[in-house]
Amino acid sequence: MDHRLLEIVACPVCKGKLTFDKENQELICKLDRLAYPIKEGIPVLLEPEARSMGMDEGR
């Protein structure tokens, strides 16, 4: 994931900052506890595609 891209993308729900989870290939919104998938190198920033994170994830 290009770090320059992380500087400009935002969570589509809260407009907050996203972090990259290299292991799971997801962009994480810690505020909303949502994980957006990255498919074939392209972030899928659609709320219906996001996965709700468990309480123990993303800490």
Curated annotation (Swiss-Prot):
Organism: Vibrio vulnificus (strain YJ016)
Family: Belongs to the UPF0434 family.
One cellular component (GO) term of this entry: cytosol
Organism superkingdom: Bacteria
InterPro entries, per the entry: Trm112-like
UniProt name for this protein: UPF0434 protein VV2354
Gene3D superfamilies assigned to the protein according to its UniProt record, in alphabetical order: 2.20.25.10
